[in-house]
């Protein structure tokens, strides 16, 4: 056990693994995740070891088409989330959001909802982006949609509902929505003033990661 902890700490120290705490609940040890920080390592361990036999037989291209390509979209979804979190932090520090965000993370837990029959039930919930402004006791929350479809009003409604489950002394002052393929017309015509939307093109234009 001691050796495992030592090895994990070494991986963290060299930047391969990240210890991720649930934002606003950092003292809750049960809400701790260890994730591969380097995206190339994530790709390697997700696909390469299982491809060894195919590659050795000269069938690497076939393996890619049959196994890697169908899963690549889901794999890139996590990369997109990291881009959006970085963008949120930078925009917050630059003063382009509704509060001075200096901390960004992810929240996960449970929420209570009603089913179609009116019965209450508890289900798992997460918020992709939570940006805190400690000096103001305010925060922004965001959702990342990496789909081949425009984000509709329901994405915002889900984000608003889930944000209420976050145990925090911070007040939500803005909702951020990120969508690979943009948004439906509703956002142009009817979205509230405390909602900001960003497409993948917006992130590239701003040079995320540089």
Regions found by a protein language model. Give the residues of each.
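Short amphipathic alpha-helical interaction segments
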Residues: 1-15
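A short, conserved structural fragment
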Residues: 12-24
């Amino acid at each position: 056990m001691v050796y495992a902890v030592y090895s994990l700490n070494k991986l963290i120290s060299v930047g391969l693994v990240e210890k991720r705490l649930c934002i606003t609940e950092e003292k809750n040890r049960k809400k701790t995740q260890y994730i591969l920080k380097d995206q190339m390592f994530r790709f390697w361990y997700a696909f390469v070891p299982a491809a060894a036999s195919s590659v050795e037989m000269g069938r690497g291209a076939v393996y890619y088409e049959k196994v890697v390509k169908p899963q690549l979209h889901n794999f890139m979804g996590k990369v997109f989330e990291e881009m959006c979190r970085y963008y949120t932090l930078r925009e917050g520090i630059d003063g382009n959001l509704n509060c001075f965000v200096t901390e960004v993370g992810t929240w996960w837990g449970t929420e209570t909802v009603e089913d179609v029959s009116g019965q209450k039930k508890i289900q798992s919930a997460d918020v992709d982006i939570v940006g805190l402004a400690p000096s103001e006791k305010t925060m922004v929350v965001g959702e990342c949609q990496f789909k081949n479809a425009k984000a509709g009003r329901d994405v915002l409604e889900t984000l608003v509902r889930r944000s209420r489950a976050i145990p925090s002394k911070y007040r939500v002052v803005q909702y951020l929505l990120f969508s690979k393929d943009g948004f439906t017309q509703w956002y142009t015509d009817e979205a509230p003033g405390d909602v900001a939307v960003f497409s993948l093109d917006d992130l590239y234009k701003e040079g995320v990661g540089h």
